[in-house]
């Protein structure tokens, strides 16, 4: 409970069981097929409770509790082909199931009986296609495209000062790429990139509304170089870049809604070094090597002056370990 007696959300008791079967087989030496099934049993007991009020003076809404029972079968299937090391394609399909943020839904209820509240679970259909490549054991590449659709969404939105679950249909799609190379026996380098986008179906039936920055992060690029000058030592330099996400306009008051603030670009360098001497391990890590000043993505997307906070500056950590 809060200090003045209001409950943040009702006290929930959940009992979950999920038997599953997962199989994998190889056909004709090169074709890999996997298949799985899962059955979820979820029983949530909800006591009688009061809806969370924005102010103590707001009228009290009493909700009669009860039990919420969920039963669901979900499947997954995947196929990959690895006869040619330089090009190994794969496709996959899976179903997801969750009772996402049930507490938020219940605490913001507008009905006085549990059975009248929309507590339907989130079910997703997930698709992925991609390929992996191994070129002479010195260069590994991978790339994939994914798409997820849900008839009932799980994005969050602000309503009367509280976060509530947006049940509008949603779709999320994106790409993931990675590359790793052994340039010399003691020198490696690599990079990875990820980009996501998510949209909601508006009342007009069009996919013209972006999901909030809480659910969809900005694009991210990571790069590294790892060098071992002598045996049992290493030096690694990392570069991390997060992109800009600016999908929303200020509201009528000229400010951004929470979760819709502009997320600006961030560039960081991190340095790590280590050496092993017999049973001793010594490592040095310097995060934010250039002491770059920036706000955390959480501060930027929330767009509330009171919660803007700088991220950590340069941070040096020395670790000593002994094995026996």
Annotate each predicted stretch with a short phrase.
Residues 189, 232, 241-250, 274-324:
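C-terminal beta-signal and adjacent terminal beta-strands/loops
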Residues 1-2, 45-54, 101-110, 153-161, ...:
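Outer-membrane beta-barrel translocator domains and adjoining extracellular loop/strand segments
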Residues 82-100, 118-173, 178-182, 194, ...:
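Membrane-embedded beta-barrel scaffold of Gram-negative outer-membrane proteins
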Residues 1-84, 205-208:
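Signature of Gram-negative outer-membrane beta-barrel scaffolds
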Residues 29, 142-150, 166-252, 290, ...:
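Gram-negative outer-membrane beta-barrel transporters
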């Amino acid at each position: 409970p809060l200090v003045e007696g209001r409950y943040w959300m009702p006290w929930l008791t959940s009992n979950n069981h999920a038997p599953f079967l997962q199989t994998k087989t190889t056909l004709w030496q090169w074709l890999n097929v996997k298949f799985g099934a899962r059955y979820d049993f979820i029983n949530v007991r909800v006591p009688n409770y009061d809806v969370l009020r924005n102010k103590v003076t707001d009228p009290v809404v009493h909700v009669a509790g009860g039990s919420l029972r969920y039963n669901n079968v979900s499947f997954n299937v995947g196929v990959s082909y690895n006869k040619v090391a330089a090009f190994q394609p794969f496709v996959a399909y899976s179903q997801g199931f969750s009772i996402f943020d049930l507490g938020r839904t219940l605490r913001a209820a507008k009905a006085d009986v549990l059975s009248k509240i929309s507590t339907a679970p989130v079910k997703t259909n997930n698709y992925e296609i991609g390929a992996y490549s191994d070129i002479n054991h010195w260069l590994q590449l991978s790339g994939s495209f994914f798409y997820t659709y849900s008839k009932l969404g799980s994005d969050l939105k602000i309503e009367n000062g509280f976060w509530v679950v947006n049940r509008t249909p949603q779709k999320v799609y994106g790409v993931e790429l990675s590359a790793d190379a052994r340039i010399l026996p003691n020198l490696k380098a690599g990079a990875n990139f990820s980009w996501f986008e998510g949209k909601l179906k508006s009342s007009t039936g069009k996919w013209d509304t972006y999901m909030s920055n809480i659910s969809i992060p900005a694009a991210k690029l990571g790069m590294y170089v790892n060098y071992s000058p002598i045996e049992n030592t290493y030096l690694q330099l990392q570069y991390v870049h997060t992109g800009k996400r600016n999908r929303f306009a200020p509201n009528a008051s000229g400010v951004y809604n929470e979760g819709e603030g502009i997320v600006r670009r961030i560039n960081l360098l991190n340095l790590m070094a280590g050496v092993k001497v017999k049973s001793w391990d010594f490592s040095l890590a310097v995060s934010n090597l250039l002491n770059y000043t920036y706000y955390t993505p959480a501060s930027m997307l929330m767009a509330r002056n009171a919660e803007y906070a700088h991220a950590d500056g340069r941070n040096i950590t020395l670790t000593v370990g002994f094995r026996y």
